[in-house]
Amino acid sequence: MSQSSIAIQIEALLTYALQHGLITKWDIDASRNRVLDVLDLDELEPVEQVDVECEMPYPILENILDWAAENGRLEANTVTYRDLLDTKLMGALLGQPSETIRTFYERYEQQGPEEATKVFYDFSKQVHYIRTDRIAKNEHWFSETPYGQLEITINLSKPEKDPKAIAQAKHLQASSYPKCLLCKENVGYRGRVNHPARQNLRVIPVELNQEQWYMQFSPYVYYNEHAIVFSGEHVPMKISTETFARLLEFTEKFPHYFIGSNADLPIVGGSILSHDHFQGGNHAFPMAKASMEKTFSISRFPSVIAGIVKWPMSVVRLQGMDRSELVKAADHVYHAWQAYGDEAADIYPFTGDTPHNTITPIARRRGELFELDLVLRNNRTSKEHPDGIFHPHQEVHHIKKENIGLIEVMGLAVLPGRLKEELELLAEALLSSDPRQVIARYEQIQKHEAWALAIKERHAHLHDSNVMDILRDEIGKVFATILAHAGVFKRTGEGAAAFDRFISTLNQ
């Protein structure tokens, strides 16, 4: 790419920033000079105004990155180094974090929380913090199950590990700044080969339970307005009375959002246990659509409606108008569960001093009511189930063997990218006259053999136009099984009786 071509791309980027309100006409010269600084250029050939017709900046950024690779501005032309540079470029076009915060809260007061979060979400995409070009690669569908439609997504947006960056990271001095990917110190951080650049990250301060928390969006966006709400302090995940108070206060401030916390123990928790945080968003998950199949009362909290949700995992739902009463009721259920054991149901709360029982709590508004779903979890392991008794069992590991975190608990399966190609190969096998022989040819689908042959047996009329739909539907059924594995009280007569035994302890 010539010097005049890079000049055109830089002007295109400035025009894009102007069109999307990232800069004003008074900022153009200073912004151009910051971009030149990032690209180590002293001057530009003058160009006429450039017409730009793109909703997001990535087509322009890709052209600039190609020029950077050709002109020695990248250490290596790999995803890691390209990401470090394009983030720095977008950071050069942004104002101070205080400006984002001020406009967010002005909009919140004047137009309401729903409009404020929507505009902030659009902003996070427009500044390329949320990489919409990658998110678009994810596959998504619904599968009908006895618990309603479950959601499935195959995650293709996280880039593959970069071998050059991994090799380079080995030579870096160990760094504890920022302490983790969730710390507020990430805002504006330049990044390293082993820590993403965050010059284009902006966060919104939110006070919860008289503490300073912050809200941002997930760069990986598994659903609409996928928000992360994190503590201003780098403190570990811990479910407590304060957790329920924070969650419910958040739904008062943002009534169009659900918000939930991962459990605070290994195996049943999320991938980050070192920094207390929640996930929320403007999305109706399958679990939120599931009804209570049984209601009961907790004598200590007469104003609280309580029930068991029709769901493959074991969920106690609490509803009420009084936020503080609901916090106390949730705390009561949580502490009862922490100490609860039932040998007949294989539930043991402790091994020595090591606790096993915890919950995954989710809060939302249902009209005027506040609602809390408390998903009962236990992280015990055994010889038969070394990864976890209430965790995906061996027979479903060909689809998913990772922890069942908050998002999966609510009915959205986030499945590994490898499944896209594996499903295509399985479709080829199922349409052949000898599926077993085709499966034997491809090592990566051999783990699916028993499942695939069972599908073939169940579906006599497989053809080009329906095979992928059937495979996707069957994945939905496996996901329902995975959730049932994670349920502490099974969906059987015995399991229902065991659940009732636990419920009865709430009134003792």
Swiss-Prot record:
GO terms for cellular component: cytoplasm. The keyword Nucleotidyltransferase applies. InterPro entries: GalP_uridyl_Trfase_II, GalP_uridyl_Trfase_II_CS, GalP_Utransf_C, GalP_Utransf_N. Pathway: Carbohydrate metabolism; galactose metabolism. Keywords: Carbohydrate metabolism, Cytoplasm, Galactose metabolism, Nucleotidyltransferase, Transferase. One of its GO terms (molecular function) is UDP-glucose:hexose-1-phosphate uridylyltransferase activity. GO terms for biological process: galactose metabolic process. It comes from the Bacteria. Its main location: cytoplasm. It is found in: Cytoplasm. Pfam families: GalP_UDP_tr_C (PF02744), GalP_UDP_transf (PF01087). It catalyses: alpha-D-galactose 1-phosphate + UDP-alpha-D-glucose = alpha-D-glucose 1-phosphate + UDP-alpha-D-galactose. HAMAP family: GalP_UDP_trans. Belongs to the galactose-1-phosphate uridylyltransferase type 2 family. This is Galactose-1-phosphate uridylyltransferase.
